[in-house]
């Protein structure tokens, strides 16, 4: 079973994503901010990370930068799920090493397609 870490500060959004992942047969773990997410990623080494950009403690860009700087987490597929839809935001996220940048609102099909493409 593949493990996916969801880093999202909005509880309703986080819980909805967790339910969707569970229904699709993934093991999902969650963090409510970037700092906790970075810690959980280093501890659990998930197969994939879904992360918001704007969050307290540490934003998604900081999480991705931290993950990519550590050998144990550098190659974990990383997808941004965010309301930040400007082309500059997309470009910046991909330049930092994100595997995909999905803007909210997104459909279940879009999310599952991005996950399928990113998972090894």
Question: What positions do the PLM features span?
Answer:
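Conserved acidic carboxylate
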Residues: 8
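Two-component/phosphorelay signaling modules centered on CheY-like receiver
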Residues: 11-29, 118
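Alpha4 helix (beta4-alpha4-beta5 surface) of REC/receiver domains from two-component response regulators
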Residues: 15-18, 62, 85-100, 110-116
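Helix N-cap/capping motif at the beta->alpha junctions
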Residues: 30-39, 60
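Active-site beta3 strand of CheY-like receiver
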Residues: 44-50
């Amino acid at each position: 079973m593949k493990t996916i870490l969801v880093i999202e500060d909005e509880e309703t959004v986080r819980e909805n994503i967790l339910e969707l992942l569970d229904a699709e047969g993934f093991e999902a773990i969650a963090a409510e901010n970037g700092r906790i997410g970075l810690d959980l990623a280093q501890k659990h080494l998930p197969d994939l990370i879904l992360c918001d950009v704007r969050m307290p403690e540490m934003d998604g860009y900081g999480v991705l930068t931290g993950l990519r700087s550590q050998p144990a987490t550098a190659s974990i597929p990383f997808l941004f799920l965010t309301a930040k839809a400007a082309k500059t935001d997309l470009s910046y996220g991909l330049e930092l090493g994100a595997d995909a940048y999905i803007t909210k609102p997104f459909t279940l099909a879009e999310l599952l397609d991005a996950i399928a493409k990113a998972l090894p």
